[in-house]
């Protein structure tokens, strides 16, 4: 266990070091300084020189705000969360929305859904339930190198549906490195060293990629999906339920994990090592070290099952009862969070209750503020008339094949998110796609869903996602290798996303992809 802890610490340090390399003592990097000036400059130039006859002044003003905020999001001139507070200042100044209307978007139901999801995830991490779940899955799947690789991917993918992909990968990487070290230590005379090296590269990448892929399984798995839910409701007044998305998301995750596993094992890092020396023994040893399931783990497990059941049954059960007919996914998330705050812990030396308010220090408040800023900006775009004007301008695309538009959007967002924040990317592009759907005469989810899913999928560069940074920080993979392997995983993801959105999603959600929805 000491080795496990040592490597977890090492990964954390390398992960943090990777991100801190670009941070100099200067208050702004060159790119940030350019963005800091360019954002307000675009705002002023738009107000002064852009005056289409059919766009009211309020629409011009919101377009100017959007350009300013988008520039600061892309360049990270100031922290992304801080940029997301600009609508609170700028929208009332232009008399687009009242302060009350703007502020209410920062307390939207979907924000509380994500808040509750984070609290549940932190409870799992606090009492180490996620480690037990991961090790149990790996132990059950098998001992061959192929099965160990698959076991790590399934375990990481499952965890990242409910906890952050960063936390899932941070847990799994040290276990993977410990297995690799054990294999080197117990290496037999007839074992090919190259095969072990190929296996360790494939294992490290498999963990990182599975952490990213797993987030597509549930609405709380990744921020872009929460943004999709919010923007869809904001623009069209319809809801994507937790249960219905799982019917779309989980098969997508299973297929993507399966194909990525085959690619890593038999194409990218093909090797002849069938069994890993000491691999299965080490997994069992880790499970034994955890001991019997503790009271607190059982409580969190029970609450987790309860939350899942409520989310899954809300659409077809809770809505049928008058008392619970108005319950939303966010209501359930906060209900289970409050239960975690109420239930006492037995190990009071560690914590008095399953969750206490110390959890506030671990919550990603910046992400929640970003959600609110995106929703406030979307409301401003709608209320100012900018959305309708954009729709009119995009009507020239009417007649273009919808599948071609979906392909272009998916590939564009996939590669854009390699160098920009996936959350900021989704926040910027989804309102545009909502308007585009009306212009080209298709259902909005045909364009918005693949963009949100693609925004989550970055496999090529360490800066693409935190999981990529973590696996790069392990020292087992180079940027060149990550980019070459990740490029093909990007293309695999694009193909699967397009097929799911075009052929599976319409059946599950009961929508006609050729039927546009009117903007609110």
Swiss-Prot record:
What exactly does this protein do?
A: Mediates the transport of the dicarboxylates fumarate, malate, and succinate across the cytoplasmic membrane via a Na(+)-electrochemical gradient.
The name under which this protein is listed is Sodium-dependent dicarboxylate transporter SdcS
Sorted alphabetically, the Gene Ontology BP terms of this entry are:
carboxylic acid transmembrane transport; sodium ion transport
Entry keyword set: Cell membrane, Ion transport, Membrane, Sodium, Sodium transport, Symport, Transmembrane, Transmembrane helix, Transport
Q: Which GO terms describe its molecular function?
A: organic anion transmembrane transporter activity; symporter activity
> Record keywords: Signal included?
no
Membrane topology for this entry? Multi-pass membrane protein
Source species taxonomy: Bacteria, Bacillati, Bacillota, Bacilli, Bacillales
Write down the InterPro entries for this protein, in alphabetical order: SLC13A/DASS
- Principal localization reads membrane
CDD domains for the chain: SLC13_permease (cd01115)
One GO cellular component term: plasma membrane
Location in or out of the cell = Cell membrane
Q: Which PANTHER family match?
A: SOLUTE CARRIER FAMILY 13 MEMBER, SOLUTE CARRIER FAMILY 13 MEMBER 2
Species in which this protein is naturally found: Staphylococcus aureus (strain USA300)
The family assignment reads:
Belongs to the SLC13A/DASS transporter (TC 2.A.47) family. NADC subfamily.
Transmembrane segment boundaries: 30-50, 55-75, 77-97, 104-124, 160-180, 207-227, 242-262, 298-318, 323-343, 362-382, 399-419, 428-448, 452-472, 491-511
């Amino acid at each position: 266990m000491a080795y496990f802890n040592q490597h977890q610490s090492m990964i954390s340090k390398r992960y943090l070091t990777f991100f801190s390399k670009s941070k100099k003592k200067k208050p702004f990097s060159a790119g940030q300084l350019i963005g800091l000036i360019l954002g307000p400059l675009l705002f002023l130039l738009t107000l002064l020189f852009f005056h289409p006859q059919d766009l009211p002044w309020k629409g011009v003003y919101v377009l100017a705000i959007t350009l300013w905020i988008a520039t600061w999001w892309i360049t990270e001139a100031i922290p992304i969360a801080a940029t997301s507070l600009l609508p609170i200042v700028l929208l009332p100044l232009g008399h687009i929305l009242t302060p009350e209307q703007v502020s209410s978007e920062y307390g939207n139901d979907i924000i509380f859904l994500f808040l509750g999801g984070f609290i549940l995830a932190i409870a799992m991490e606090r009492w180490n339930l996620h480690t037990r779940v991961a090790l149990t899955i790996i132990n059950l799947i098998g001992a061959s190198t192929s099965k160990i690789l698959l076991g790590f991917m399934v375990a990481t993918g499952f965890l990242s549906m409910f906890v952050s992909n960063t936390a899932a990968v941070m847990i799994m990487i040290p276990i993977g490195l410990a297995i690799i070290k054990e294999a080197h230590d117990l290496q037999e005379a007839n074992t090919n060293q190259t095969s072990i090296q190929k296996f360790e590269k494939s294992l490290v990448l498999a963990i990182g990629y599975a952490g990213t892929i797993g987030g597509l399984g549930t609405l709380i798995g990744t921020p872009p999906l929460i943004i999709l839910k919010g923007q869809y409701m904001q623009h069209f007044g319809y809801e994507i339920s937790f249960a219905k998305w799982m019917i779309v998301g989980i098969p997508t995750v299973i297929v993507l994990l399966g194909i990525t596993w085959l690619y890593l094992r038999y194409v990218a890092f093909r090797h002849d090592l069938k069994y890993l020396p000491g691999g299965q023994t080490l997994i069992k040893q880790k499970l034994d070290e955890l001991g019997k399931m503790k009271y607190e783990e059982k409580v969190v497990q029970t609450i987790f099952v309860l939350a899942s059941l409520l989310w899954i049954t809300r659409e077809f059960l809770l809505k049928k009862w008058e008392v619970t007919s108005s319950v939303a996914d966010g209501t359930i998330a906060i209900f289970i969070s409050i239960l975690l705050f109420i239930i006492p812990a037995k190990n009071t030396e560690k914590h008095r209750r399953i969750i206490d308010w110390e959890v506030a220090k671990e919550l990603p408040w910046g992400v929640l503020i970003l959600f609110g800023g995106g929703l406030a900006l979307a409301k401003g775009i709608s209320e100012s008339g900018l959305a309708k004007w954009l729709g009119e301008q995009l009507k020239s695309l009417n007649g273009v094949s919808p599948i071609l538009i979906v392909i272009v959007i998916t590939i564009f967002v996939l590669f854009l998110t390699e160098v920009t924040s996936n959350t900021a990317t989704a926040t910027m592009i989804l309102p545009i796609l909502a308007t585009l759907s009306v212009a080209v005469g298709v259902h909005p989810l045909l364009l918005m869903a693949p963009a949100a899913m693609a925004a989550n999928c970055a496999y090529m560069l360490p800066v693409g996602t935190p999981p990529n940074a973590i696996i790069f920080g392990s020292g087992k993979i180079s940027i060149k290798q990550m980019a070459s392997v990740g490029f093909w995983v990007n293309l695999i993801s694009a193909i699967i996303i397009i097929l799911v959105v075009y052929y599976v999603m319409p059946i599950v959600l009961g929508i006609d992809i050729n039927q546009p929805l009117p903007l609110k």
